From Swiss-Prot:
PANTHER family: 2-C-METHYL-D-ERYTHRITOL 2,4-CYCLODIPHOSPHATE SYNTHASE, CHLOROPLASTIC (PTHR43181:SF1). This is 2-C-methyl-D-erythritol 2,4-cyclodiphosphate synthase. It comes from Escherichia coli O127:H6 (strain E2348/69 / EPEC). A divalent metal cation binds at residues 8, 10, 42. Its cofactor is a divalent metal cation. The lineage of its organism: Bacteria, Pseudomonadati, Pseudomonadota, Gammaproteobacteria, Enterobacterales. The gene is ispF. 4-CDP-2-C-methyl-D-erythritol 2-phosphate binds at residues 8-10, 34-35, 56-58, 61-65, 100-106, 132-135, 139, 142.
Amino acid sequence: MRIGHGFDVHAFGGEGPIIIGGVRIPYEKGLLAHSDGDVALHALTDALLGAAAQGDIGKLFPDTDPAFKGADSRELLREAWRRIQAKGYALGNVDVTIIAQAPKMLPHIPQMRVFIAEDLGCHMDDVNVKATTTEKLGFTGRGEGIACEAVALLIKATK
């Protein structure tokens, strides 16, 4: 078994909506990013790549490459997952924690879990997504951006 950890953060800027966990969430602010700014899927992709010792999302999909401008993070996750599976790994489970003062994530979490399970080709029981605030402390608490942490457990597939 192998475990990976991922972290991502994006500052608010421009107009909404925002995309988190593949879900378009109405909000007056947008997120500044080279791709679609989906902190949840970026952190998850990093966790999966880390567990497989395959670097990180910036190595695989550099923000200096115009091909990834405005990229759909679900597509990036699926491509990273294909590469990880090709290395002989299967999914154990993933756990994602979104850190945001606003907007409220709870109504959107069920759909996030559906999208992640679809993209990884796994059962919903293998995907957990939760959200928390920082009780108005730090940059997320001041409403300056959104952060996310994720962990992933991979299992070496039998040969």
